[in-house]
Amino acid sequence: MPEQSLPPTVFHMLEKNVGNQIRVILDASYGFEGTLAAVTREPAGIWLSDAEAVILRATIAQPIPQVASREERSEIFVHLNSVQRIEVIHGPSHR
């Protein structure tokens, strides 16, 4: 019988993206964008470097939320209990 591999956990998926630009959505209109610097298990969270707080807006004409404004931050720890969604940003920086 072939050995079955376990599916990757959230931590494995996050660890694969260390060093990449990500957007962390905390609620429908607020989140953070920055470079994923580290993943911790106790407490469960992520560290972002060169982070910015972002305000997201959606309209009837554009239902997918877009970044409406940004505010510079520095290093930020985000606990995974407060995260709704994490997006990996591919390509050139959106700053």
Residue ranges and their predicted role:
Residues 2-95:
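Conserved RNA-binding domains used in RNP assembly and mRNA/RNA metabolism
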